[in-house]
Amino acid sequence: MSYPEIYPPDQPGFHPIATARTMFVDEIDRAGIETMLERLEASTAMMRAVQIRVLGGAMARVPDDATAFAHRDRKFMVNVAALYERPEEAEVYAPWVADLAAKLQRGPVGAYVGFLGDEGEERVRDAYPKTTWDRLAEIKARYDPSNLFRLNQNVPPTGT
């Protein structure tokens, strides 16, 4: 299937919905690959994916506390996703994503904040080690103490 066939241009009213789960893993073994392939083939989602991004190299040489992005020592970032057309299909595809992600999780829990959906504060916390979270909360308290800019993957200011 070519890319234009995935999202045909000028298709009025077409607004796909996505559900996804992001994580970091330290190992992808044969059983994990077979699980991915079996689940992808079995899914009826209009588009489904397991995206694997190999990490390491220069980014792994940056200390965790040098920036807000952490988990630099992890081997892979994985994103499991399903796209569908009708809101009621979430009942089918959200559990599919969650189950497949749980089967692939290897190592400590983590998340890439740029791929998080509306998953709650616990998942936002998964994106940052405690020291990074605390540092971001202190910065937020200094520059946005009323938490005006909160309609995002929010780190609340210290003291709230």
What is each stretch, according to the model?
Residues M1-T160:
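Soluble FAD-dependent oxygen oxidases
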